[in-house]
Swiss-Prot record:
Pathway: Metabolic intermediate biosynthesis; chorismate biosynthesis; chorismate from D-erythrose 4-phosphate and phosphoenolpyruvate: step 6/7. Catalyzes the transfer of the enolpyruvyl moiety of phosphoenolpyruvate (PEP) to the 5-hydroxyl of shikimate-3-phosphate (S3P) to produce enolpyruvyl shikimate-3-phosphate and inorganic phosphate. The gene is aroA. It comes from Granulibacter bethesdensis (strain ATCC BAA-1260 / CGDNIH1). Residues 1-31 are annotated as: Disordered. Phosphoenolpyruvate binds at K34, G107, R135, Q182, R365, R409. This is 3-phosphoshikimate 1-carboxyvinyltransferase. InterPro entries: Enolpyruvate_Tfrase_dom, Enolpyruvate_Tfrase_sf, EPSP_synthase, EPSP_synthase_CS, RNA3'P_cycl/enolpyr_Trfase_a/b.
């Protein structure tokens, strides 16, 4: 799919139970990690010298980040599929863009880039697609305003947004009211061009790709536990000289989740997923599935580009319900829709606790995930910020039309559900899958999935 997706062109897809299990006679490769790909492009643009990136995700979200960094003066070149070069401008060296920065569907790109822009002496305007324009930005702009940047948004703190950055950014000491890797990262990126120490306190540990990559580029980043031991305090020394570095982007565990869960649920399946990122702050889904009874093993553990990776083999398994504690939510925040699909097929009840953050994703993912299941005959309840799924102990009824709300993860979850149900499941629009997992349908049908255009 091209970089410029038309918001008006939907792509309905039907998913049916396959005649046999999902299998491959070779390791399966899913796209590069989206979170790391965004950060590699942004931090590479702030470094001195040429950064080489291999395994970059070439989905629409990351391509928007690449275009934005070019617009800000960095040289960003694609040499081959997944192989990119970034000639950085140095901290404080980005230039004012001539046009609006369109971040498409990517909340990660929009929020992280807001941090970059906040500590540069320039003016920029940022927008996004219809979905992104509904998502709140104040959780980022409120703390960043304290560093001296100015922001003007639509009502409710939504895009489009005008940013007046500052070349004299003040270092921040900020306590996150809700654990969010995006907000933490935006503050750290702004802190790169602030004199002194920037400190972020988070109530629960969130993915630490920004901290790992900043260290890889030469920044001084220290992490210590909070007093209660549940969260972390991150300290960044401002105005380092970031040095260009080589980055190997691991396979995205959030993307690997979809073929992995499909193989767990379709009888007779067995696949191996190669080089999947195993950052312990991203593996909550894998831990939960093992608790549910998944036959999941990890081999060839190694470090690539500063991140732990490994090869995951998964076999069809009989699952049972579990309770997912709220402190695990940050390590699997993007995986709750697909976990809910596994819970729907499992026996017993699965309760996922503390999911408030799902309400401000590409859609209200909490409500949308519940609707995805209920329209296909699965009993599901929302109690406060908890999602409760009463498993069918086998194939759910299915037969529903799932409204995906331009949300790639809901669309993929619906299509995986359809591989398990008695009647086919239709996703009303699968076009937005390309934002994070280009080639999803090709990969899945290659394993034996039965997808067809509606």
């Amino acid at each position: 799919m091209s970089e410029n997706h038309s918001e008006g062109a939907s792509r309905p897809v039907i998913s049916r139970r396959p005649a046999a299990g999902l299998r491959a006679d070779h390791p399966v490769h899913v796209p590069g990690d989206k979170s790391i790909s965004h950060r590699a492009l942004m931090i590479g643009a702030l470094a001195v010298g040429e950064t080489r990136i291999s395994g970059l995700l070439e989905g629409e979200d990351v391509l928007r980040t690449a275009a934005a960094m070019r617009a800000l003066g960095a040289e960003v070149v694609r040499d081959a599929p997944g192989s990119w070069r970034v000639a950085g401008r140095g901290i404080g060296g980005l230039t004012e863009p001539a046009d609006v920065l369109d971040m498409g569907n990517s909340g990660t790109a929009a929020r992280l880039l807001t941090g970059v822009l906040a500590s540069h002496d320039l003016f920029a305007v940022m927008t996004g697609d219809a979905s992104l324009r509904k998502r709140p930005m104040r959780r980022v702009t409120d703390p960043l305003a304290a560093c001296g940047a100015g922001f003007h948004t639509r009502s409710g703190g939504r895009l489009p947004m005008a940013v007046r950055g500052t070349g004299e950014a003040l270092p921040l000491h900020y306590r996150l009211p809700v654990a969010s890797a995006q907000v933490k990262s935006a503050i750290l990126l702004a802190g790169l061009n602030a004199r002194g120490e920037t400190v972020v306190e988070e109530p629960h540990a969130t993915r630490d790709h920004s901290e790992n990559m900043l260290r890889h580029f030469g920044a001084t980043v220290q992490v210590e536990p909070t007093g209660d031991g549940a969260g972390r305090i991150v300290r960044l020394q401002g105005q380092p000289e970031l040095r260009a570095a080589d980055i190997v982007v691991p396979a995205d565990p959030s993307s690997a989740a979809f073929p992995l869960v499909a193989a767990l649920l379709v009888p007779g399946s067995e696949i191996t997923l190669a080089g999947v990122g195993l950052n312990p702050l991203r593996t909550g889904l894998f831990d939960t599935l093992v608790e549910m009874g998944a036959a999941l093993t990890i081999a060839n553990r190694r470090i690539e580009g500063g991140e732990p990776v490994g090869d995951i083999t998964v076999r069809a398994s009989t699952l049972h319900g579990v309770e997912v504690p709220p402190e695990r939510a940050p390590s699997m925040i993007d995986e709750f829709p697909i976990l809910s699909v596994a819970a729907a097929v499992a026996s017993g009840t699965t309760r996922m606790r503390g999911l408030a953050e799902l309400r401000v994703k590409e859609s209200d993912r909490l409500a949308a995930t519940a609707a995805l299941l209920s329209v296909n005959g699965v009993q599901v309840e929302i109690e406060g910020d908890d999602l409760i799924v009463i498993g069918c102990g086998g194939p759910p009824p299915g037969g529903g039309l799932v409204t995906t709300y331009m949300d790639h993860r809901l669309a993929m979850s619906a299509l995986v559900l359809g591989l398990t149900t008695q009647a086919p499941v239709t996703a009303d629009d699968a076009a937005f899958i390309d934002t994070s997992f280009p080639g999803f349908a090709t990969l899945m049908t290659g394993l034996g999935a039965d997808f067809s255009c509606a």
